[in-house]
Amino acid sequence: MGYPEVERREPLPAAAPRERGSQGCGCRGAPARAGEGNSCRLFLGFFGLSLALHLLTLCCYLELRSELRRERGTESRLGGPGAPGTSGTLSSPGSLDPVGPITRHLGQPSFQQQPLEPGEDPLPPDSQDRHQMALLNFFFPDEKAYSEEESRRVRRNKRSKSGEGADGPVKNKKKGKKAGPPGPNGPPGPPGPPGPQGPPGIPGIPGIPGTTVMGPPGPPGPPGPQGPPGLQGPSGAADKTGTRENQPAVVHLQGQGSAIQVKNDLSGGVLNDWSRITMNPKVFKLHPRSGELEVLVDGTYFIYSQVEVYYINFTDFASYEVVVDEKPFLQCTRSIETGKTNYNTCYTAGVCLLKARQKIAVKMVHADISINMSKHTTFFGAIRLGEAPAS
């Protein structure tokens, strides 16, 4: 917005409507008419419109003046007091005179002013200027002192620049206004709304699977404090079973009187046709089908066995083994005597350290013999002597 826009604004039509309104309402002694009330309302409407136009003109003028002040300050900072732009802009006293455009248009009658009606007396120019200045001071009392000071400053500038040529102001006017310096940054705005949720990310690389190897055991902790002694329990009855357990446990098995051919009647050569004569069930357990004797308690055991054999098919000797978990522990071998009968017995015994769940059995070595399972000549047993010695 520049200075030429001020010259193109229309003059303020304030005095003419006032005089017409006063004549229409008969305030100057005219005879009353029938439509006097309507004329008063019409006058008030025109008066309000005129007042609104006044206010609009004043607002535009104040905006123009502030723009010119900013432009002048920028040019003075950039080029100093003798810059061409400053002298050209301020060479005309009416460019920054806050009252100049208004009083010039109001003081000189223009062709846009409405003609006076017959019987109206025009107000003198001085009274019109004073009337407009009074309105300006009434609505903007703070601008009065600044307007007078600005007018005096423009006049001094005009006198100091009067020696310049006539082409200088015209050239400066054609340049136009320059851009002012950037203002300070404004306060940050409010945060915006949250954006939409983004797509899911790429799954990460799976980690290295851990190992199930147990680490080395840590050092033993310090011993805890000794607890208080417990309460004395009630006196118990004498345990008779303890004395029985301290006694030697015995098992004795006998044949049932049958005759057995090893090749046809025995599976794997193990004798299984036993009858129990005596057995401690807490220490021994017999498996009838397999013929094995299981030990239930660790300890030192005396194992014994005897078998009556009958030689057949020109066999001149017989042999059997006492096995522990199918491993040979004792072995007995007997040959036939010349001129004797084919029956003969073979006895063997020994001491062995056994652990719980170990099994004892009698196994024949040769298959071409027959066994006489008589209860007096064929038997098998074991005696627990005591606990195993400490290693």
UniProtKB/Swiss-Prot annotation:
PTM characteristics: N-glycosylated. Processing by furin produces a secreted form.
Main subcellular location of this protein, as a coarse class: membrane
Membrane topology term: Single-pass type II membrane protein
Biased composition (Pro residues): 181-203, 216-228
InterPro entries: TNF_dom, TNF_Ligand_Superfamily, Tumour_necrosis_fac-like_dom
PROSITE patterns: THD_2
GO molecular function: cytokine activity; death receptor agonist activity; death receptor binding; tumor necrosis factor receptor binding
Similarity comment: Belongs to the tumor necrosis factor family.
Disease implicated: Defects in Eda are the cause of the tabby phenotype in mice (the equivalent of anhidrotic ectodermal dysplasia in humans). The disease is characterized by sparse hair (atrichosis or hypotrichosis), abnormal or missing teeth and the inability to sweat due to the absence of sweat glands.
Protein's name in the database: Ectodysplasin-A
Gene expressing this chain: Eda
